[in-house]
Amino acid sequence: MMAADRPIVDAQGCITHAPRSRVVDFLRPGDLVIANDAATLPASLQGVHAPSAAEIEVRLVWRASLDAADVHTFSAVVFGAGDFRTRTEDRPLPPFLAPGDCLLLGPLSATIDAVLDHPRMVSLRFSGSPQSVWAGLARHGRPIQYAYMTTPLALWDVWTPIAALPVAFEPPSASFALDWGSIRTMRERGIAFATITLAAGVSSTGDPELDRRLPFDEPYRIPEATASAIHHVKREGGRIIAIGTTVVRALEHAATRDGSARGSREREGASEASGGEAPRALNIVRAGDGVADQRIGPASRLRLVDAILSGTHEPDGSHYQVLRAFMDDRTLADANAALETMRYRTHEFGDSVLIERKVAAATSLSCDSCRPLWLQLCPA
């Protein structure tokens, strides 16, 4: 044990605990830490379904790009009357929705372009200029919130310390573990820091059928400086440390072996079916925009990311599936048992877990006992 009441999982399944403030101690010179700098949109909108005069809540969950001018068309989940104080899974259905219906959302007006393949999910289009849509969201929207947080959240409550472009529908919450002090300490110790931007989606829709589709496709952007830093670190044999599942999703979608752009699930499947990993020094990532449309889970072959700092997640959620790409189920189950014993928090403002990918751990050990696998649970 590293401290009397704090938990790393080694090859023998031994779990160690440490405060989140010590996370930099488990990194090493030559590592590259990459975080998602997306700021969170006020994506929850109370309003009225004009044809029925029924009260509704609209939760924006997707748009096609990160372009600030591309702010008219969204996919959204629509609830009946109520707000976050009622558990999402207990929220009533909206009134019957049809293409052409007008939704009055405070200063904003939106038209349903299409009801998608679920009665609660629609494609809607806001009226007005991009500037007026942004202004209406800022004035009337609130952060998407769930019932376990009983106090209404302000927008700044869901912005991480590195929040920049407002494109996320829920916060990329792993970045709450960062602060400018820890980033400064990283750089003082020869640990590089870079960012990507990915429009983090929602963690729950309240409907089991829709939740099984999560995560929805997520647009992302990888800056040239970040791509260059990745190339340099991999060439020098360093590790890529992803801050959160959204960073893993973006980087693994963009990762290539031959210099061609990552494009489709089919190409990923063909690569995995061919057997074995190419030498990791050959892995590259292209700068630019993309849309992460893949699912990452226990069968995934991670091409680029060596370790992840993540929130602690419920085993039935899509975020947890990403953790299964890094660690075997038995060790994760042991970690979850420790999590419950220590009463760690599992929501977006909860505690953190640091996991090094098992294959990477065998050749890039970072601790005195030469563990081939380690995991760090960090109380807030």
Task: Mark where each language-model region is.
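A cross-family signal for N-terminal binding/gating loops and helix N-caps
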Residues: 1-367, 374-380
